[in-house]
Amino acid sequence: MRKLEERIMKDGLVLPGNILKVDRFINHMIDPVLFEDLANEFYEKFKDKKINKILTIEVSGIAIAYACGIRFNCPVVFAKKTSSKTLGDNCYRTEVFSFTKNRSYEVMVSKEYLDEKDHVLLIDDFLANGKALEGLIDICSQANATVEGIGILIEKVFQKGGENLRRQGYTIESLARIKGFTDDSVIFED
C-alpha cells in the first residue's frame, strides 16, 4: 500500500539490528486517519471471507485490530501476555518469542472468546520471523477455530516468517513489504 510505504519513508527510523521504529504513527502514537485507511485496505482484501472475529496479540496489534473490527463489524480479541485474577485458568495458552524484545512470552486467550464457530482474521503490526503469528495460529488450533487469513501492516520479507506461513497454506496480506534496509532507509519489495 503506497500510502503506508510513504509514511514509513517519512516517519520511520531504521535502527541497528534490522529494526524499524514506527512509533510516530503505528505503535506508540497512532494516526487514526491512517489506521482507518489501513483497515479499509484489509477489508477489501478479506471481504469475501467469513470473518466473525479478529485476533491479535498485545500490545502493538491492538490498535489496527480495533480499526479492522469496526470495518468488519466483528469483535476483536487480543492474546494477553500476562495473566490476571480475572482471566482465570480457562484459557488457551502458548509461548511466543518476540524478535524486538528478544524474549519469550506465554500468551493466553480466554476460552470464552474463541471456539470452533469462529472464522478468524489474524492481524498484527509486524511479521518478521513469524513467531507471534505461529502462537496465534496455535491458539486458534486449540480452539478449533478457522484461520481465514492474516493481515500484516509491515512484513520483513528478508526474514522467513511470511514465507514459512505461506508454505503452510495461510493467506497473508501485508500492506508494506520490506526486502531490506540500508544504513538509514527502507528498501521495499516491488
From Swiss-Prot:
Domain of life, source organism: Bacteria
Main EC class the enzyme belongs to: transferase
MF (Gene Ontology): xanthine phosphoribosyltransferase activity
One GO cellular component term: cytoplasm
Pfam families: Pribosyltran (PF00156)
Binding, 5-phospho-alpha-D-ribose 1-diphosphate: 128-132
Pathway the protein takes part in: Purine metabolism; XMP biosynthesis via salvage pathway; XMP from xanthine: step 1/1
Reactions it catalyzes: XMP + diphosphate = xanthine + 5-phospho-alpha-D-ribose 1-diphosphate
Disulfide bonds: none
Main location: cytoplasm
GO biological process per UniProt: purine ribonucleoside salvage; xanthine metabolic process; XMP salvage
Residues the entry annotates as binding xanthine: 20, 27, 156
Subunit (UniProt): Homodimer.
PANTHER family: HYPOXANTHINE/GUANINE PHOSPHORIBOSYLTRANSFERASE, XANTHINE PHOSPHORIBOSYLTRANSFERASE
NCBIfam families: PRK09219.1, XPRTase
Protein name per the record: Xanthine phosphoribosyltransferase
Annotated gene: xpt
